[in-house]
Amino acid sequence: SDPALKDTKLLVHRTDFQDIMRRFLKGDEGMIEAVMYWLRHLGGEEGIFNYITSHTGFTLNDLVSYDGKHNEANGENNQDGPDYNYSWNCGAEGPSRKKAVCALRNRQIKNALFLVLLAQGTPCLLAGDEFGNSQRGNNNVYCQDNPTGWVNWRGLKSNREQWEFVKELIYLRKTYCVFHPKEEMNGMDKVGC
C-alpha cells in the first residue's frame, strides 16, 4: 500500500523447478509426476520463473560434466557452495575427449534447454549456458574475478550448434501459443470434451 512501491515487483527465489528437472535429467526414479506438474505450472497470478542453472551453482555445461563441486580455488577448502547439485558427469569427471561422453553431455544439455525453454512460466538461462560456458566445476564463483567466473564468449564460435538449438527453441516458444498459454494446462482437451 506504500505509493513508493506501487510499481515494484517482488520475485521469489525458488529452486523447485531446478531441483526436480536436475534429478529427472540425471535419471532419479519417481520424478515423472513432479516433472509433468512443473512443465505445465504457471504459478497463479504472480507467475513463475523457471531455471535449471543460476548465478548460484553449476553452469549447464558443468552440471553434465561434474558429479561434485570443485571450489578449491576459492580458498575455503572446498567447503563453500552447495553440496547437493543433482548433477551427473555422464561418465567422466571434468572435461573429456571421449566421443560417447561428449555426445551424452550434448544430449543432456539439449534436454535441459528443452525443459527450461518449453515449460510454462518465464524461462531463465544463466549467461553463457546457451553456448556451453564452464566454471570448471566451481559452483560458487563469488570470489573468482578471473576467467573462472567470467563468461567465455569464444564458446559462441566453438559451440554454434548449441547456440542455434537455443534459438530454435525460442522460436518455437514465441511462435506456438501452446508454450505460453494464459491458463495452466490440466492434462485434457477442455474444448473437445
State each model region's role.
Residues 1-127, 140-144, 177-184, 191:
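Conserved alpha/beta catalytic core and glycan-binding cleft of carbohydrate-active enzymes
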Residues 158-193:
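Catalytic cores of secreted or luminal carbohydrate-active enzymes
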Residues 116, 130, 169:
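Hydrophobic, well-ordered secondary-structure elements that form the walls
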Residues 135-167:
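Extended hydrophobic/aromatic segments used for targeting, binding, or gating
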Residues 126-131, 135-136:
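Short acidic/histidine-rich active-site segments
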Residues 39, 89, 151-154, 164, ...:
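Short linear interaction motif-like sites in intrinsically disordered regions of transcription factors
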